């Protein structure tokens, strides 16, 4: 069993049209729009599709899976082969994809990235976290890092099952013990890192060594050696 993560920025050169036509959904072809936000989100979806294609190749799996993506009632994309799971996240101009391959058991993964920006962190923490976690947050020197750690890990575990941010407060986070508990995700482990241009949290439903990280750089994936991360046990 192996886990792969690729991330990239839509301002880097990339060509989805380099893929075989049958692997490109109609809704991912180029669009014309006057809305910069609509264009940005569309480009993020296009890059995510390309990153998933590249990860399938690296993993030695058939890229034909790209034409066999289904969606749950909540809209979460998945493959019919339960031993292979993937998840996508984007924030601003950044995109990340996680792909997990298991030999026999069912795979479940979730990923969340956030491009940092200043927010009312205290108000958001009061909305999603209990008093003990808020106290921990207020004692951290780097409030930006602390907030996105609390936020990203919640989203990542919930996205493994297709739950949205409405359940964020149902995730119990113990930062000192590096443990996470939730009724809305299976047992597993999670990594959080602030080493990249984005904050990133990734969940897998099994015990796994650090995923293989790749960065999209000038039309190809390049290996990224991650050195700084926090490992959590989940449930």
UniProtKB/Swiss-Prot annotation:
- What top-level class of enzyme does the UniProt entry assign? transferase
Q: What protein name does the entry list? A: Putative 4'-phosphopantetheinyl transferase HI_0152
**What keywords does the record list, in alphabetical order?**
Magnesium, Metal-binding, Transferase
Query: Can you provide one Gene Ontology molecular function annotated for this UniProt record?
Result: holo-[acyl-carrier-protein] synthase activity
What do the Gene Ontology cellular component annotations say?
Answer: cytosol
Q: Which family does it belong to?
A: Belongs to the P-Pant transferase superfamily. Gsp/Sfp/HetI/AcpT family.
- Print the organism lineage: Bacteria, Pseudomonadati, Pseudomonadota, Gammaproteobacteria, Pasteurellales
Metal-binding as a keyword of this entry, yes or no, is: yes
Look up keyword Transferase and say if it applies. Answer: yes
Cofactor(s) annotated in UniProt: Mg(2+)
Function description: May transfer the 4'-phosphopantetheine moiety from coenzyme A (CoA) to a serine residue of a carrier protein domain.
What Pfam families does this protein's entry cite? ACPS
Q: EC number(s) per UniProt?
A: 2.7.8.-
Please cite one Gene Ontology biological process associated with this protein.
lysine biosynthetic process via aminoadipic acid
């Amino acid at each position: 069993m192996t886990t792969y993560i690729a991330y990239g920025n839509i301002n880097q050169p990339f060509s989805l049209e380099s893929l075989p036509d049958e692997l490109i959904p109609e809704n991912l072809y180029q669009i014309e729009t006057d809305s910069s936000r609509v264009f940005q989100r569309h480009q993020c979806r296009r890059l995510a599709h390309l990153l998933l294609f590249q990860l399938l190749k690296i993993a030695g799996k058939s890229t034909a899976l790209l034409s066999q993506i289904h969606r749950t009632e909540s809209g979460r994309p998945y493959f019919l082969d339960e031993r292979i799971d993937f998840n996508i996240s984007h924030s601003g101009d950044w995109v990340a994809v996680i792909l997990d391959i298991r030999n026999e058991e069912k795979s479940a993964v979730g990923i969340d990235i956030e491009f940092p920006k200043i927010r009312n962190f205290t108000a958001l923490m009061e909305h999603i976290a209990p008093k003990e976690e808020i106290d921990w947050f207020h004692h951290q020197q780097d409030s930006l890092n602390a907030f996105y750690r609390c936020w990203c890990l919640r989203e990542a575990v919930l996205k493994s099952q297709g739950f949205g941010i409405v359940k964020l407060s149902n995730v119990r986070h113990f930062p000192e013990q590096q443990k996470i508990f939730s009724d809305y995700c299976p047992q597993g482990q999670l990594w959080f890192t602030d080493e990249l241009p984005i904050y990133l949290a990734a969940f897998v439903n099994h015990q796994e060594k650090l995923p293989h990280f790749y960065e999209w750089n000038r039309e190809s994936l390049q290996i990224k050696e991650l050195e700084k991360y926090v490992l959590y046990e989940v449930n």
